[in-house]
Amino acid sequence: MGLKYFSHLPEELREKIVHDHLQQERKKEFLEKAIEDSCRRHVSLLKSDPSPSEMYSLSKFLDSLADYVGRQFNTRCLIKWRKDVPANIKFQVMEEQHLRLYGFLDMDDLSCRELLPPEEDDDITYEDGMIVNCSELDKLFAALGIRVVYITVSNNCICTPLNKDIVIS
């Protein structure tokens, strides 16, 4: 609503609109802080040797965060794994994603794709039952006109596209 029309509204309605807007902003700030705190808690798992329950927690958190980010941007959101994340962590999380989506179906196929060529020095993601290089996936999505955003996981941070300030180191 333009400011020109806003100034002509009754005082009570203007106050209600301002109050509702501020309430939405406070909710958004609270949620961003909660996401930041959760990222901080989960980033510590990237440096240690996490237990199976911690891996499950990390996987569930990243999936929930990807769903939320996807809804906020009204597009597909994937988890981009940087090269510096230990292989055992990223592949366990991707395996957990696969199990949630497909059960034990095609688990052998997923295991074979863990062995990416050593000359491939690219970030990877899990998409539709496969582990793929992000650069190849970006080219494919661009050619198809599909917009995608990423949650980037590296050895010492989890970055979201929600707010550039939510970079946890």
From Swiss-Prot:
Q: Where is this motif: LXCXE motif, interaction with host RBR?
A: 110-114
> Impact of mutating P10L?
Loss of binding to host SKP1. No effect on viral replication stimulation
Region listing for Binding to host SKP1 protein, in residue ranges: 9-22
Outcome reported for the amino acid change (mutating C112R): Complete loss of viral replication stimulation
Q: What is this protein called?
A: Cell cycle link protein
| Keyword hit for Amino-acid biosynthesis | no
**What is the phylogenetic placement of the source species in the record?**
Viruses, Monodnaviria, Shotokuvirae, Cressdnaviricota, Arfiviricetes
Q: Which organism is it from?
A: Faba bean necrotic yellows virus (isolate Egyptian EV1-93)
Q: Which family does it belong to?
A: Belongs to the nanovirus Clink protein family.
- Keywords for the protein's UniProt record, in alphabetical order: Host-virus interaction
The record describes the protein's role as: Interacts with and disrupts the function of host retinoblastoma-related proteins RBR, which are key regulators of the cell cycle. Induces transcriptional activation of E2F-regulated S-phase and G2/M-phase-specific genes. Inactivation of the ability of RBR to arrest the cell cycle leads to the stimulation of viral DNA replication.
Cite the record's note on assembly. Answer: Interacts with host SKP1. Interacts (via LXCXE domain) with host retinoblastoma-related protein 1 (RBR1). Interacts (via LXCXE domain) with retinoblastoma-related proteins (RBR).
Domain of life assignment = Viruses
